[in-house]
Amino acid sequence: TFEKLETKEQVMQFYDVLQINLKKLGLKSVHSYEDLIDLKYNRFVQEIEFYGVFLESKMIAGSMVFLFDGSIMHTQYLSSDEQYQKLFPMDFLIYHLIECAVEKQLELFTFGICTENQGRYLNFGLSRFKEGFGTEFCLNKSFEKRLLLS
C-alpha cells in the first residue's frame, strides 16, 4: 500500500530504508534523521512530505518530497529495500507520487538528477528508468567563480 507518512516513527522507517540503500552505494546521507525531523516538523511544515510503500507493515520504499510554490513536487530522496525489487516498489511509489501531484493540481513533478560524481557522468540506467514514466530531462545550469586565495 501507498501512504503519506505522518509520524516521526514512520519517518524513521523511511530513514532506515534510505540508509541501507546509501550504504550499498557507498554514499552517506546529507541529512541525519534529526535533520529530517527538524526540517519537516519545525522549519518547512507545509513544504515537506514523506511517503512510503508498505508490504503489510514493512516499509519497502519511500520518498521525501518538497512542494514548491504550489506548483512543483520534487523528490529529494527516493529509496527502496533491495530485497523487494521483484515487487517493483519504486515504480509503485513514483506512480502514486505522480498521482498525488495531479490531485494537488501541481504543474510539475521532478525527480532529480541522473548523474554521478558531482554531475560528471550520466547514469544511463537511472535516466531510462525515469524516462519510462514519460518524463523529459532538463539541463540545470551551474555557475562557478574561481577564487584566487593567497
Language-model features and meaning:
Residues L39, L93, L97, L126-K130:
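A general structural detector for well-ordered alpha-helical segments in enzyme core domains, enriched
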Residues T1-Y84, C100:
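A conserved beta-strand-loop-helix scaffold within acyl/acetyltransferase catalytic domains
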Residues K104-S150:
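Active-site/acyl-donor-binding loops of N-acyltransferases
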Residues Q85-A101:
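Conserved acetyl-CoA-binding loop-helix of GNAT-fold acetyltransferases
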Residues Y41, Y84-F88, N117-N123:
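Accessory, usually C-terminal, subdomains that scaffold auxiliary metal cofactors
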